[in-house]
Amino acid sequence: MNWQYIHSVLPQFFSATLTTLKISIISIILAILVGLICSILITYRVRVLNRIAQFYIELSRNTPLLIQLFFLYYGLPKLGIKIDGFACGVIGLTFLGGSYMAEAFRAGLKSVAQGQIDSAKSIGLQPTQIFRYVIFPQALAISIPAIGANCLFLIKESSVVSA
């Protein structure tokens, strides 16, 4: 084993690790936001936006990440949109992760018992208050295991970004 070679490339490994962590953390934060918005649009059936969110989730979950990244990196410049590699990786992982997060949040929102919502209505809470104080805290607690699994999934998928 050539220890001098390992010692010479070690800084590159640390640099690559930091880049991977940056891409993963930014993508996870953005994916959680995208997922939450999409799950609310789907769960509460906001007219046209509901269909757009469903289309986005189906498209993202049913195409491989590598194909999505190829489209972003090679396809968008053909349309006149220039994106650097880092931004392409973040957008691609966010696009993929947002759909999985949306399904995790949707499951959490659907699992809140109707009796909880009826009780909140009976004490005079407004719909936004019901969502903020009754539905969202319970849905978030239920969704945390799936969100954690999706975060790990995105960290693992960040290896594809290097391709």
Which residues make up each language-model segment?
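Transmembrane alpha-helices and adjacent helix-loop boundaries
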Residues: 1-163
